[in-house]
A protein has these predicted regions:
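Short, charged recognition helix plus adjacent turn
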Residues: 3, 79, 87-110
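A short, Lys/Arg-rich alpha-helix, primarily the initiator
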Residues: 3-39
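Short basic helix-loop element that most often maps to the first helix and adjoining turn
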Residues: 30-50, 76, 108
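Residues in the recognition helix of alpha-helical DNA-binding motifs
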Residues: 36, 50, 61-62, 91
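Core residues of bacterial helix-turn-helix
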Residues: 40, 51-52, 62, 81
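Recognition helix of helix-turn-helix/homeodomain-like DNA-binding domains
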Residues: 52-69
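Short, basic-rich loop-to-helix N-cap that marks the start of a DNA-contacting helix
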Residues: 65-79
Length: 110
């Protein structure tokens, strides 16, 4: 019985627009990633090859907000763009998991 009450309380706190907002934030992350890739003077195909990805279209999916940078290759992605992995991951966390970002770094941190 207690468990059901806990689940009910949790369900009441879920954001109603989680999916559309999430897609919008992924698109903003993708725009940022596209700018960083352009700064590094890499095409989508170049970056995909350097990351060992089979299809360059995955880069397009990420940049257009349809997918996220996988955690397993986040460090390599940062390095290929000439960025430090920790700040890169932190910046993406702000888009991919805004509530987790707020809990870890505070609302004012960017």
């Amino acid at each position: 019985m207690k468990r059901a009450k806990h689940q009910d309380v949790f369900a009441e706190r879920l954001p109603v627009k989680a999916v559309p907002e999430g897609k919008q934030l992924r698109k903003l992350a993708g725009d940022w990633l596209k700018l960083r890739r352009a700064d590094a003077e890499l095409s989508q195909a170049d970056l995909a090859a350097r990351l060992g990805l089979k299809y360059y279209t995955f880069i397009s999916q990420v940049e257009n907000g349809f997918s996220r940078v996988p955690t397993e290759i986040m460090g390599a992605w940062a390095s290929e763009l000439g960025l430090e992995p920790a700040p890169f991951a932190r910046h993406l966390l702000m888009y991919y998991e805004p509530e987790m970002y707020r809990l870890l770094f505070g609302a004012e941190s960017k």
